[in-house]
Amino acid sequence: MSDPRPSQAEKHKLGRAASKFKDPSRAMQSDDYFARKFKAINGSMGPATLNTSSLSEGGGGGGGPANGTPAVPKMGVRARVSEWPPKKDCSKDLACKTLWESRSQSSYESATSIIQNGQNDQVDRQQEEQLDLDFVEAKYTIGDIFVHSPQRGLHPIRQRSNSDITISDIDTEDVLDQHAVNPNTGAALHREYGSTSSIDRQGLSGENVFAMLRGYRIESYDPKVTSSFGFPDFFPCDTAISPSLHAAAQISRGEFVRISGLDYMDGGLLMGRDRDKPFKRRLKSESVETSLFRKLRTVKSEHETFKFTSDLEEGRLDRGIRPWSCQRCFAHYDVQSILFNINEAMATRASVGKRKNITTGASAASQTPVPVGPAGGCESPLGSKEDLNAKENPDADEGDGKSNDLVLSCPYFRNETGGEGDRRIALSRANSASFSSGESCSFESSLSSHCTNAGVSVLEVPRENQPIHREKVKRYIIEHVDLGAYYYRKFFYGKEHQNYFGIDENLGPVAVSIRREKVEDPREKEGSQFNYRVAFRTSELTTLRGAILEDAVPSTARHGTARGLPLKEVLEYVIPELSIPCLRQAANSPKVPEQLLKLDEQGLSFQHKIGILYCKAGQSTEEEMYNNETAGPAFEEFLDLLGQRVRLKGFSKYRAQLDNKTDSTGTHSLYTTYKDFELMFHVSTLLPYMPNNRQQLLRKRHIGNDIVTIVFQEPGALPFTPKNIRSHFQHVFVIVKVHNPCTENVCYSVGVFRSKDVPPFVPPIPKGVTFPRTGVFRDFLLAKGINAENAAHKSEKFRAMATRTRHEYLKDLAENFVTTTTVDTSAKFSFITLGAKKKERVKPRTDAHLFSIGAIMWHVVARYFGQSADIECLLGISNEFIMLIEKESKNVAFNCSCRDVIGWTSGLVSIKIFYERGECILLSSVDNSSEDIREIVQRLVIVTRGCETVEMTLRRNGLGQLGFHVNFEGIVADVEPFGFAWKAGLRQGSRLVEICKVAVATLTHEQMIDLLRTSVTVKVVIIQPHEDGSPRRGCSELCRIPMVEYKLDSEGTPCEYKTPFRRNTTWHRVPTPALQPVSRASPVPGTPDRLQCQPLLQQAQAAIPRSTSFDRKLPDGTRSSPSNQSSSSDPGPGGSGPWRPQVGYDGCPSPLLLEPQGPGSVECDGSGDHEDLMEVGRLPETKWHGPPSKVLSSYKERALQKDGSCKDSPNKLSHIGDKSCSSHSSSNTLSSNTSSNSDDKHFGSGDLMDPELLGLTYIKGASTDSGIDTTPCMPATILGPMHLTGSRSLIHSRAEQWADAADVSGADEDPAKMYTLHGYASAISSSAADGSMGDLSEVSSHSSGSHRSGSPSTHCSKSTGSLDSSKVYIVTHSGGQQVPGAVAKPYHRQGAANKYVIGWKKSEGSPPPEEPEVTECPRIYGEMDIMSTASQHPAVVGDSVPEAQHVLSKDDFLKLMLPDSPLVEEGRRKFSFYGNLSPRRSLYRTLSDESVCSNRRGSSFASSRSSILDQALPNDILFSTTPPYHSTLPPRTHPAPSMGSLRNEFWFSDGSLSDKSKCADPGLMPLPDTAAGLDWSHLVDAARAFEGLDSDEELGLLCHHASYLDQRVASFCTLTDLQHGQELEGAPELSLCVDPTSGKEFMDTPGERSPSTLTGKVNQLELILRQLQTDLRKEKQDKAVLQAEVQHLRQDNMRLQEESQTATAQLRTFTEWFFSTIDKKV
């Protein structure tokens, strides 16, 4: 017998198979690993007999087992693992286990001597030492056990026909040696397969062992024996009591097999988590083992084989097993480039072109599974079951078990029945729902403004394309499209570049394209002038595409020279595994780039064919559907919706293999286009029908070869299952069932079947919805079909086909299109360098790659918050995207735009990235590398506008207050100057992202406030604001991508926005108009009739996706996310969600936005698109040129006609004061008395400032102030105004950033863009009607005043009827109409306010206006609603005076009000619509008994008046500069109210943080000078009122101050109102309605540059108005000219079209005449 101790070189020599051994005994030696374990358990064994059908009997050798009875395994072709060997004594087993787990590197004999109780080893001691050393040198993985690869020198266990041992009988310290013998018997342990072997040796050539294993079926398979592994049945065993599993478990616990993250295995041989390393030498890379096991357990395809190096004694693995890591400095162009793995290409090279066809699609489901029994378990890989069983056991997949009335669960298929959504690994409120059942995921992802994970492709976005991605603007995102395939066409084709082809010995045919280009913006690259673009292609479908900066490449040449670096050095650095000498330069032929284009773009197709099967009632089988000769009316209706019928004969567009010449495939077909795609439908009823052919092969020939099939079911059809279909190609079935066909309420329900290896695709089907018959449903269905086919191409079957094609392309290029020129070396041959020392390469510039445009990649571990797990990912950060790609599934797990990143918290080895509204992802470095985190932070600084977060610990003052306001977004609205929060560094505009370690993104507003109020220690993590004080926001909040997309039907009325579905089938209870969208200015929540439509409203709100974090609580208590108005950047003032059914002013809706509605009519979202609004909103021209009197008076007329419920209730507000009194405690931590207020709110008047109209949030019972500064119980008289004016609105925000954008404000605005003063006044009163002072979440305190994404924007109001909020609109009632008293009655206040009406005239009961306490009045704007009714509707005060509507520029109004304001100094700069679009609304803070300056009661009043213009004019005051600070303290030196004080009040509210920093220490509540004429008793009463004491005196006093201060504002508004009249050039009537005394007193402003008298103001106004009129007149003239030009162009266009048609007809006539003449001559 030959020496059983071969040398290492001999033992591991590559390419040596067992069949080459000359010695027969050696040839039969076992390669099992567990020989010593066998001795311990089984004792000595007798001589083994070769090639017999019986197992050798143990016990013949030196000693018996511990129990004294030799164990005899059962007889048979295979050893029964489940019952062999018998269970040993527990103590003995324990001893074995203890020894095994405590084993160190001791020699083998010391261990085995204990286990075997003195058995004499028959193997030489030196051999044992050698074996043990071998084990120490090479740690064997699970791949060693299962992979047979003779060429690698590794020989795993085989299932033998004749076996003498079982799995558990082998010791794990045995080395993999084909020459090993049984130490006890001397018999060879390695057995060749016996005569009954069913394993075909063709698979053992080393090229692919999994092909052999997958086709192999175990011979004597007992039904009770199941596999304990996740692999095809390699080892049959009984998982219940098998001692084999116990032994294997011990082996695993002893770290024989070390596999990371394995949890799902049956706890036997393969155990889960990582262990400590007991040996010095392990497999070097943990990721190597993970990748290995991942591939093993998924058994994806044959091409995933694993290669080992020949020098295992060094413990090294070949690079084929190690995940390839591209150079960090390489910037990837697209997602699939990040997934490029050159090692996979090496591993799969041998199997390319040899992969078997496997049964997939419907055929896999239709195959009847063959039960596996003892007789049927063994089949050859080449047997009859090859196709079906090539991947795994046919009965292994039972489907997902999901069924409904549309679909039945089916093996090999996965169902989508509704509610499925994209996986979210980020920490947000949305990921609390499960991945598969989260209904919110469905609605969010169906219309999200963000790319879905599968929709992200190109990562490098040019600067000019960054503002808006066109794909996002469209309704549905197309997924699974490799848009990066255009890389060569875009950056190489037609440009100077080099192509190199070759056949690498490891990779096979390869193609490299490389081009040096100058960086377009060197400033971004910090001096780097050039980069190299590289495209590297192998036979794998993934291509390495990207660029590397020249400065990042180590080279022997100088960087930045005109010549550039040697290409060889660039390629060696980027792709070190590539054999550069094999490359040859491509031939100089025009065919080369064309072939490369075909190669790269072979997977791109914009032409799809989709089959349509018609299923009648009671049908379900394929044969029945194919034999439906003609279509029914319901099917015809569906086809008409889906596309257009085309005549096939002569059809020149995409015909999908249909005959367009002889009509052999039918005369007509269905064709349509969607985005860039052409779709031809193979409709079963339009294809030829053969009465005598039951199989209808002419139809099945086309439909059966379509990947995607739509199955249309009539009512009564049976549920569909792919089991009834027989086709290898049909991988996706979209089931569409019609309800109420051929009626107005026709709708469709949808379900989807997809083959199990087809990845999910969007748009997701919302749960429990039906789709109306609209264009939106059509788009949904077409997008679903396109994405289905794209996803199907990701399945294994189609990828294998594409890989073969790609391999042939590359092979052809490498063989037929190359020259003899190799890749250039660094320098040409030079005599000077002969004999010189080799030149060293210059090190690259540090961190140069961080300035690349493409995606830089890091290996990280991401926290999956939805499942509380960690997943290994690849982090890619480009100039546009941040994405995480899961290593295991190779799918994008997360993506967001860099412009949405607002901050990050970086640690030593981890980083938390916050984006959008505080959602976050948590990443940590794989190898605990702090350098990776540093680079990630640097990269974020370069490509985002975020910043590092700051952690603060906030203290409470003596009253338990934190001293700041925070709105529902977590943005700090106000900070008490010099308070604890201010001293800690908290500033206005800061964004709270964590409160007490809880992410704000996961909290509702109420939870956030409760956390701040109740936490003993308040630790917050904040993101500092921008330098201008504006909070950091994601781009999706600021610009709302995509824009609103209206789709007009045939009547020209807009269909619903991007909401293709409703929550339930009650969607169709409304007539056809219900299918139309909510007009932006249309919804009126104040009508009781709307209560009937609440289900519809809830459906509408649910359909609107959310990209903002606000909540809206519906009447039923559910929360909605209304702000993402169809992912709109301009939702307009009209509703962006459901409306509160409660009346605004007890049933009196807003006079501006009312819809015509008859009594008792039902109005739902989208059900009333009204004529006047459509006049404004339907066409832009009408918006620009509609007469203002017609537009706005019609609003007001409808206001009067809409609801008469307010006519009998002049004092209806008397009950509100009681409702507002909820909590009078002043000990709350946030100085809030009414933070969680009364729930019986009334809100939503439908006014322009109605937060529901603004798309703002509604949180029932939550305080906008976050309870930090809210009000005590206040009287109803001042209740409403305080509701709005108690908060500051810092609107300086982001006007500067958009100053150069489109300008829609200015003096030349069209009069159609107007507010009625009544409109925004009623907004205040409507909020007052809410009855809850502290309950202002619906007008939530936005710190920066710009609109929320879903809130009204002004520039897109052409289609919505919204008005321009960049101007102060002062509109009087026109037409001489008598305003009914009912309009004014709701604006009267109970108590003191009812004694007089604020306006230019005051009643006798009003106190004298010279009280200086007016500056402490809590309502500068509070009574503006009364003022507006007095000024606009003189019927309230006296006779109606007909006045025209007028508009005053906002800038001019501010100049009038604030002469010294920076707005004037800046020359009345205009503000872009982006400022108005910004999702930040004005900060509407409730009146507080304790102001932000907690001890100064009155100062909160003064500071809170700021919002008067903000409430009236959302985003009207976008202060783009930092205004000077003006004290909010009452002016103690001015006995009369002054414009200066008014200005101060404005600017304190709107000032930036730098202004606040100049505040003096507030001290106690300021007291006015006694000389001011204020009675001290009144002051005491006021103070008592602040403390929550309810007294008539207090009410009257406060009401008086509020109304008087508002009177001053009213005076200016009315001045503007009067002077802007076209009939009033000079306003001589002013003296008639203005009290000269009062006018003097509150117009006199000592020390101001502006005129100090009313006359001066009038003159100033006259000048302004004349200029405005002049500008307006010029603008109208210009527009008229433009309209005339447009009309001329249209006429010219029509004329040219007619001429073209005439010329065409003449040419046709001439052609016919010509040919007829020729024919006659012939």
From Swiss-Prot:
Modification type Phosphoserine: residues: 149, 380, 384, 1030, 1245, 1461, 1472, 1478, 1488, 1549, 1552, 1591
Domain PDZ: 951-1027
Name of the protein in its database record: Signal-induced proliferation-associated 1-like protein 2
CDD domains on file: PDZ_SIPA1-like
Low complexity: compositionally biased ranges: 1091-1103, 1120-1131, 1220-1237, 1328-1355
BP-aspect Gene Ontology terms: presynaptic signal transduction; regulation of small GTPase mediated signal transduction
Organism, as annotated: Rattus norvegicus (Rat)
UniProt gene name: Sipa1l2
All copies of domain Rap-GAP, residue ranges: 596-813
Biased composition (Basic and acidic residues): 384-403, 1197-1218
Biased composition (Gly residues): 57-66
Gene Ontology cellular component terms for the protein in this record: cytoplasm; glutamatergic synapse; postsynaptic density, intracellular component; presynapse
PROSITE patterns with a match to the protein in the record: PDZ, RAPGAP
Coiled coil: 1652-1712
GO MF term set: GTPase activator activity
